[in-house]
Amino acid sequence: MRTICITGSAGGIGAATRDRLEKEGARVIGVDVRDAEVIADLATPTGRDAMVAAVTDLCRDGLDGLVAAAGIMGDQPLVVAINYFGAIATLDGLRPLLARGTDASAVAISSNSTTTTPGLPIDLVDVILAGDEAEALAATSRAPGVFAYPAAKLALARWVRRHAPQPAWIGAGIRLNAIAPGVIETPMTKNDLEFIFSIPDVFPVPIGRPGRPDEIASLLAYLLSPDAGFFCGSVVFADGGTDAAVRTDDYPTPRA
């Protein structure tokens, strides 16, 4: 039986992924602020440390898979605290358990907003990636508009790309990848769906509907499985065609 940890397991994509994996026979350790095996607030260093300690206590023999799905929208500094710093603390903190697992795989949840948000300030992304959380939260508070979410998700995707090929990850037998969902119908996004689908010239969704959490869960289950054994450092888009529609010719970009 595989043992897999999912943060954000109480709702949305995390809950759908839990359901999918448990139906496949996996033992799932859920992490959330409610209705989970491990109750933890990933917005704070103390909460992250408590999460790592609790998961370690429950998984003495190691982890075979990890999904860093905890995330929020709304308050800008809190978005960065949870969606970036909470995610990398999860990935780094549980990496020793993954190293003891079998055919281990970790997947972070990024977003297609990383490539489809006009005017996203890359300097904010760089500040987040630099790793000083206090400075990153301060910079986020000063940033215009609602750039915290895409900036945090872009920083997370780049963190995954930087770390996946390194000895600490693939060198230890751990595959690290990310996915970039588009508009998914979850409790977190329900208030935004009508607006998003009212501006097709700005934010097209060629498939014509929001995605379902179970569709993303299927992708995550695949990336966690041995069938995805050649994936390392990939950021897989599942967004109904939005990224392709707005970036038709600027991906892939040839190496300089």
What positions do the PLM features span?
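Structural signature of the Rossmann-like NAD(P)-dependent dehydrogenase/reductase core
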Residues: 6-7, 68-69, 105-111, 175-180, ...
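Rossmann-fold cofactor-recognition segment
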Residues: 33-50, 55-56
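Short, flexible catalytic-loop segment of classical short-chain dehydrogenase/reductase
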Residues: 180-191
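Short C-terminal tail/terminal secondary-structure segment
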Residues: 232-256
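C-terminal helical subdomain
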Residues: 89, 148-150, 154-157, 178, ...
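Catalytic loop of short-chain dehydrogenase/reductase
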Residues: 71-76, 99-171, 183-184
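N-terminal Rossmann NAD(P)H-binding glycine-rich loop of SDR-like oxidoreductase domains
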Residues: 7-10, 14-19
